């Protein structure tokens, strides 16, 4: 969790909250009602400005869920032919270590000897609007990018890249999904890194 930790280490106020909560209930499923889930979701949606939120256990699980949501939208709303949906990703990405996610990694150590790999992903140069536009076709469901890449250093795209990608997605009826596990929650001076570009992703 080296890149996902957003709350520091052993802050006294957080330790107390964690301890107090564990005395009440340590873990439960969304399948069961608790009196804290509603207020939690209300807080998250108010902070983020999105209408909905889905709590997950990890960044990789969140990305996997975003992939599933994008594919379902592509088949049900965009009417892409079944099992043909594609998602555009960037070279040098890091979204997690599940079997699906490593399938679109460009890092050999992350994917070698773990095949066969999951199809349905097209990788383009990070920061290139032209590459994104050229990769889009009738089967493109979504783009999935990090606003700032964190696997090989702190790699920022050109200033105009996210606004360009937003425009390209709007023009082609493609979802824009941003993974902010490493760049979100105030790490860049704003709640989400995409806010510096004055755009809003779909998820």
Question: How does the language model describe each region?
Answer:
Residues 1-203:
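Conserved N-terminal phosphate-binding loop of PLP-dependent enzymes in the Aspartate aminotransferase
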């Amino acid at each position: 969790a080296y890149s996902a930790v957003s709350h520091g280490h052993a802050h006294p106020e957080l330790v107390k909250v964690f301890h107090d909560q564990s005395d009440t209930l340590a873990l439960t499923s969304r399948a069961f009602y608790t009196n804290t889930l509603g207020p939690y979701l209300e807080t998250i949606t108010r902070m983020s400005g999105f209408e909905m939120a889905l709590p997950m256990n990890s960044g990789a699980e969140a990305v996997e869920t975003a992939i599933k949501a994008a594919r379902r939208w592509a088949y049900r709303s965009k009417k892409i032919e079944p099992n043909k949906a594609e998602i555009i990703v960037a070279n040098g990405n890091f979204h997690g270590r599940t079997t699906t996610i490593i399938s679109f990694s460009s890092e050999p150590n992350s994917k070698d000897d773990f095949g066969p790999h999951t199809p349905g992903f097209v990788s383009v140069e990070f920061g290139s609007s032209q590459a994104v536009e050229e990769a889009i076709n009738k089967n493109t469901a979504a783009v999935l990018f990090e606003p700032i890449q964190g696997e090989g250093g702190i790699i920022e795209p050109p200033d105009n890249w996210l606004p360009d990608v937003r425009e390209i997605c709007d023009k082609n009826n493609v979802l824009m999904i941003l993974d902010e596990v490493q760049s979100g929650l105030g790490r860049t001076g704003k709640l989400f890194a995409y806010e510096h570009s004055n755009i809003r992703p779909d998820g």
